[in-house]
Regions:
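Transmembrane helix-loop junctions in multi-pass membrane proteins
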Residues: 12-21, 49-57, 112-119, 140-148, ...
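Hydrophobic alpha-helical transmembrane segments of multi-pass integral membrane proteins
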Residues: 28-55, 200-206, 223-248
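Hydrophobic core segments of alpha-helical transmembrane domains in multi-pass membrane transport
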Residues: 4-13, 103-113, 129-143, 160-173, ...
Length: 314
């Protein structure tokens, strides 16, 4: 929450005061610069606010600021560094293989949503995203240790910047030093409060499901050919994928692949990301956010079942 406040206030204030830089940024790129921002940053780590400032097209804000940031942006800047540094070594290969499944299906859903939103030059704007997915897949399978180091450094830089920006926000709030504007500080207070309510509600909902539907969960897990821990992990991921991390080592192999694949797009769909998106955008964007993330997450799960079935047949 601290880093969210820092990024939101400082990044928007900076962009407000440097609009000429943003206007010239597109002159050096063959694609919309918001695509690059959305592919590298989570929505609540500055991704959405930066995209909103640099893009004049409301549909591109939905595409890059809402969808890209909440899928591949969140995966790169938040999920991968945390999981790769906290999972047991034996679980990392299964996790990375699942992430690969999630990355493979993600462009399919994004292209369909882009067509629905009528994004100009969609396939040209998809080039950097496709290249980024290919690079990630290549890094994962060629040199996993180096990939972990690079992503960890990137995530730590984002985290440190977030805390530094929050410190500057605090200085401005008390001493009016001009690092940001007071209206942004008041606005971010409201955003964080709404996020907290939604996250708390989603966690309570998950606990109620686990408490009163444990038998149904066990039966459903048997039908899906995964163990109970894997199914619980999927349910928890709807709120936050971090909640399923302690369960990862207890999952069966297929369950690990499914949870990792789903986390690329489906994680946080009813958690903090939903709270943030609902706070800063309209109901249309929020609806697209939920439908697209769930669709990509479910498609990733189906991809895992398809490939594991073929392996068993071979």
């Amino acid at each position: 929450m601290l880093s969210i406040s820092g990024f939101y206030c400082i990044s928007i204030a900076f962009l407000r005061n440097n609009t000429e830089i943003l206007n010239h940024l597109g002159d050096f790129l063959f694609f919309d610069p918001s695509i690059l921002i959305g592919s590298l940053l989570a929505p609540d780590l500055g991704g959405y606010s930066i995209v909103e400032m640099i893009s004049k097209d409301p549909n591109m804000i939905v595409f890059a600021g809402v969808l890209l940031t909440s899928t591949i942006g969140a995966t790169i800047s938040f999920q991968l560094p945390i999981f790769l540094n906290n999972l047991e070594k034996d679980d990392v290969p299964s996790f990375m293989q699942g992430i690969a499944y999630g990355l493979i299906v993600l462009p399919i859903v994004l292209i369909l949503v882009g067509l629905f939103l009528q994004i100009d030059s969609l396939m040209i704007n998809m080039i950097p995203l496709l290249v980024l997915c290919i690079i990630l897949l290549f890094m994962f399978f060629i040199n996993l240790k180096l990939s972990v180091k690079i992503l960890t450094i990137f995530a730590n830089m984002i985290r440190i910047l977030g805390y530094l920006f929050f410190f500057l926000v605090c200085l401005t709030f008390f001493f009016d030093l001009g690092f940001t504007q007071q209206d942004l500080i008041q606005e971010v207070f409201s955003i964080v409060f709404q996020m907290t309510l939604i996250v708390a509600g989603s966690l309570v909902l998950c606990q109620l499901i686990l408490k009163y539907f444990s038998l149904q969960i066990e039966k459903l897990a048997t039908m899906l050919h995964i163990n109970q821990y894997a199914l619980i992990g999927l349910i928890l991921s709807l709120g936050t994928s971090i909640a399923m991390m302690p369960l990862f080592s207890k999952m069966d192999t297929k369950g690990k692949l499914i949870n990792a694949a789903f986390s690329v797009s489906g994680a946080y769909v009813f958690g903090g990301q939903l709270g943030f998106i609902a706070s800063v955008s309209n109901s249309f964007s929020t609806t697209i956010f939920i439908i697209a993330k769930l669709s990509a997450g479910i498609l990733a799960i189906l991809m895992v079942y398809l490939f594991t079935k073929r392996r068993m047949e071979n």
